[in-house]
């Protein structure tokens, strides 16, 4: 479908609902709170129904940007008393979630960020396209290195969202298992490989 955005909201709540979360939901929304308010409180993250997902890559990346990360019974409190600044980050492996988080943090951080061993899945390239439409300065190198130059603000955008590759593969698997025929609208073959 079509997505439209008008840039950052005037008000962003500084904390999440502890009853919501506990999974990856919300991890990417943290950057907006931290950039706009200088702090964010989110429920403890780290998994979903599939299983646990370590978040230490995310926390280490936020620390590299200058954030202070405090874990407590309430959740994870992130503060940036001196703002967020560009960083040199190398991920232990090309994590999609960690790459998304670094991109979303770096676009509004002061200075240049170099991200090594970044994920380059179609969803990452689509996020980069959206951020560039909003005014972000991002350069993707062929060796999984991404350079992000922080900007003062992001603007609105229009973008056609990428289809869900997992959903398309699930439908294709169902058709194969049932020996049926199915058409998955919007799926692009080159991004399924």
Model-derived segments and their meaning:
Residues 1-19, 23, 29-193:
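Short, structured segments at the rim of ligand-binding sites
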């Amino acid at each position: 479908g079509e997505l439209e955005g008008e840039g950052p909201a005037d008000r962003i709540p500084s904390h999440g609902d502890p009853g919501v979360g506990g999974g990856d939901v919300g991890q990417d929304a943290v950057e907006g709170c931290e950039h706009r308010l200088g702090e964010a409180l989110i429920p403890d993250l780290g998994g979903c129904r599939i299983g646990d997902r370590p978040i230490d890559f995310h926390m280490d990346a936020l620390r590299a940007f200058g954030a202070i990360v405090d874990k407590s019974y309430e959740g994870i409190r992130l503060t940036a008393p001196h703002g967020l600044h560009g960083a040199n980050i190398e991920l232990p492996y090309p994590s999609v979630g960690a790459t998304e988080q670094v991109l979303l943090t770096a676009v509004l951080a002061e200075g240049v960020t170099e991200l090594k061993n970044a994920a380059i899945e179609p969803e990452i390239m689509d996020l980069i396209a959206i951020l560039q439409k909003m005014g972000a300065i991002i350069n993707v190198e062929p060796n999984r290195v991404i350079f992000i130059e922080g900007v003062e603000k992001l603007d609105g955008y229009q973008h056609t969202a990428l289809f869900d590759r997992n959903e398309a593969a699930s439908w294709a698997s169902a058709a194969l298992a049932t020996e049926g025929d199915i058409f998955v609208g919007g799926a692009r073959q080159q991004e399924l490989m």
